[in-house]
Amino acid sequence: MALRTAASEQLIRQQREQRTLVAGLRKKERALKQELKKQQQQADALGRRIQQVIEEEARKAAAAAAAKKKNATQKSTAPSGYLMSKDEEQLSRNFAQNRGKLPTPLSGRYRIIAHFGTQQHPDLKYVKINNQGIDLQTQPGTRARSVFDGVVTSIFVMPGYNTSVIVRHGNYLTIYSNLSTIYVKTGDKVKTGQELGVIYSDPEEDNRTVLHFQIRKETTKLDPELWLKK
């Protein structure tokens, strides 16, 4: 009888511990889902900001062309409406010819922790993530660098992504997000491999250092892994 009672009490304790464990896991899952939702909202906000920058650049280019009608025949129009000079046309062609040959957008070692497009979350079965670029994890102090010759057209700050730098290569654009210290300013011409700034290290996550990188042909999002050299 005593043995049966002890076994029953042990079973009750195990069941209680199991319920506590399950409750804890569910709580962590809810917290993770909330954090992922916040991150996705921040990513969407970044995407909208980039879209606004591209559209504003197109408007400015069109206005400049209208103000100089005598040179209008020397301009060509990209699919989105961005008016390119002859030099920009050539830069676009050069960029396109380097598909699969571009250097990595950072110095030093790295690993890709999030790929382009919609994908299944590794830990949450029914959660999908939509990434407009790729995320590269590296070491603290690593610099982001331009993958091709171009012009810095915009620098801005967004929640969750710190400072972003956009470099235009004709009608192609590369975006470098989650930077802290910035080495360039709007209007600067940059060369392939030129350092743009230091990638932010998060002190609340053991100095986790991640660069978010995008490539676009005007408003069309492209998979950076198809453009970078393997």
Predicted regions and their residues:
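Conserved, short, structured surface segments that act as functional micro-motifs
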Residues: 165-168, 186-230
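Conserved positions in beta-strands of structured domains
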Residues: 113, 152-153, 180, 197-200
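Solvent-exposed coil/turn segments that connect beta secondary-structure elements
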Residues: 28, 51, 117-118, 141, ...
